[in-house]
Amino acid sequence: MNNIRNFAIIAHIDHGKSTLADRLIEECNGLEAREMINQILDSMDIERERGITIKAQTVKLNYTANDGNQYCLNLMDTPGHVDFSYEVSRSLAACEGSLLVVDSSQGVEAQTLANVYKAIDNNHEIIVVLNKVDLPAADPEKVKLQVEEVIGIDASESVLISAKTGLGIKDVLEAIVAKLPAPQGDVNAPLQAILVDSWYDTYLGVVILVRVKNGVLKKGMKIVMMSNNATYQIDNIGIFTPKKVMTGELSAGEVGFITASMKEVADCKVGDTITEEKRPCSEALPGFKEVHPVVFCSIFPHKTDDFKYLREALEKLHLNDASFTFEAETSNALGYGFRCGFLGMLHLEVIQERLEREFDLDLTATAPSVIYRVTTRSGEILNIHNPSDMPDPTKIEIVEEPWITATIMVPDQYLGEILSLCEERRGEQEDLSYIGNTTTALLRYKLPLSEVVFDFYDRLKSISKGYASLDWEISSYLVSQIDKLSFLINGEPVDALACIVHKSRAEKRGREICARLKDLIPRQQYKIAIQAAVGGKIIARETINPYRKDVTAKLYGGDVTRRMKLLEKQKKGKKRLHSIGNVNIPQNAFIQALKISD
């Protein structure tokens, strides 16, 4: 066990952690040269294209150090995006140390901070690795100072590398062997293992990634999940090199995978403790929590026939990612679809993109919303994320909305605009400080989640030319003035456009969407009224004027009553059309109307 090292790589998006993982695998001959592809551990196409890591991955490397000993290195590649921060915290709980990768041309960013603090909470030994030192803009000395001032860890012995060219990779491996502690654990104690991640494999069923803390996992053993007391029998045990290699057993300190004829990923919750049925351990490992969706939206297929394919696609994705939820719903305007819950906006985009790309579906997504807590006059408490479930305003006592604590790091020259963005989003400033003697400001804000889920992240990035970074966590529910904004077309409510908004925004939002619909809905033979309403009160209106056929064109001379008669006849015809005519709203009108403008 003294020759095992379990470590994670922590980095902000784009600081090069997946590339560093590639170089470490190459250096330890984990794969033959012909099998090597860039970002080998990012197994989904979408992970490679967006340059993000979504699922935590693991790989076991054998390394012969300069001292002549053979070491077994278990590398955990963790996601870097704020939506997946729980996956990060579980991966970190399975390790004893971390490599903190910082881009030496950009310096420390907000998500790096959040993940480093998680590593420190797990008592990790941290090795600072400064990447991209071959870039002209790299300034390792400045970044070392920044690491010491911002994070408060010693960076004097940082390893300087370029993951792209392979410079300094050997030094990283030597530092891992020399500085990181070996795992602690007792092979003879009752089994205690942490479930780090799980995914679905078409041949093996659910594959579970585990780190054994105490005891031994063996093939054929009966195991128990401590969160729900479900029991299973182990079919296969193995490790990733990063190819699957069956080993038959895993003992204390080791990381590997097991399969146990599970049908669904939802059965195994990330962070859960696994123990033996015959000889269970006395307590579960700390830090487990259920992950709940934060952002909700409805997804509808363009063709109604695709509904069953959409259900199958969602079920397949759910096999791999139990953190999003879905239930069927119907809409008068858009037909059959699903109400889905996600961990955040990136998670929503990734799932939607995977549905469209991997399953070839054309989809419409409604405006995202968050969970509001409504207390009715009768004292009932409802959790509501779908506008159609909102009770009548006369029955509501109070509505509470979720607030978050956001940490924003931003260069000084963009500070003013970022502050006004936060104020515009109803934010309350808690703290503003400068990092050491740099020109980077560290902001702490309390913001309503509903203002952040839309386009806050995009606006933050565009204002700061991509230099600002954001990390957030939900802090509390606060009483707020929330209204349901409905839209009527010729007096008929359109459920797909309804949304829940803050009172101060209702009128502006109503006007915006009405104006947009006016441009998008084609003209008819009769007048169309587009209205926005809160409760029973109309707060905005646009009118689409009808086409007018010139029925008097063929008249010339003659009596004026002939002219009047034709115009009267046209008027009656339009009136009849208006009473029986349905306004056909094209699908793209919904999609365009729901896009949030800056």
From Swiss-Prot:
Topological category with respect to the lipid bilayer: Peripheral membrane protein
Domain tr-type G residues, every copy: 2-184
SUPFAM superfamilies xref list: EF-G C-terminal domain-like (SSF54980), P-loop containing nucleoside triphosphate hydrolases (SSF52540), Translation proteins (SSF50447)
UniProt cross-references to Pfam families, sorted A to Z: EFG_C (PF00679), EFG_III (PF14492), GTP_EFTU (PF00009), GTP_EFTU_D2 (PF03144), LepA_C (PF06421)
Binding site for GTP: D14, H15, G16, K17, S18, T19, N131, K132, V133, D134
Transmembrane segments: none
Compartments in which it is found: Cell membrane
Keyword Thylakoid recorded: no
Alphabetic keyword roster: Cell membrane, GTP-binding, Hydrolase, Membrane, Nucleotide-binding, Protein biosynthesis
EC number(s) recorded for this UniProt protein: 3.6.5.n1
Cellular component terms (Gene Ontology): plasma membrane
GO terms, molecular function: GTP binding; GTPase activity; guanosine tetraphosphate binding; ribosome binding; translation elongation factor activity
Catalytic function, reaction form: GTP + H2O = GDP + phosphate + H(+)
Group of enzyme by EC: hydrolase
Any one biological process term the GO annotation gives: positive regulation of translation
Family under the similarity heading: Belongs to the TRAFAC class translation factor GTPase superfamily. Classic translation factor GTPase family. LepA subfamily.
HAMAP family referenced in this protein's UniProt entry, alphabetically: LepA
PANTHER family in the cross-refs: TRANSLATION FACTOR GUF1 HOMOLOG, CHLOROPLASTIC, TRANSLATION FACTOR GUF1-RELATED
General function of this protein: Required for accurate and efficient protein synthesis under certain stress conditions. May act as a fidelity factor of the translation reaction, by catalyzing a one-codon backward translocation of tRNAs on improperly translocated ribosomes. Back-translocation proceeds from a post-translocation (POST) complex to a pre-translocation (PRE) complex, thus giving elongation factor G a second chance to translocate the tRNAs correctly. Binds to ribosomes in a GTP-dependent manner.
Name of the protein this chain belongs to: Elongation factor 4
Organism: Wolbachia sp. subsp. Drosophila simulans (strain wRi)
Lineage: Bacteria, Pseudomonadati, Pseudomonadota, Alphaproteobacteria, Rickettsiales
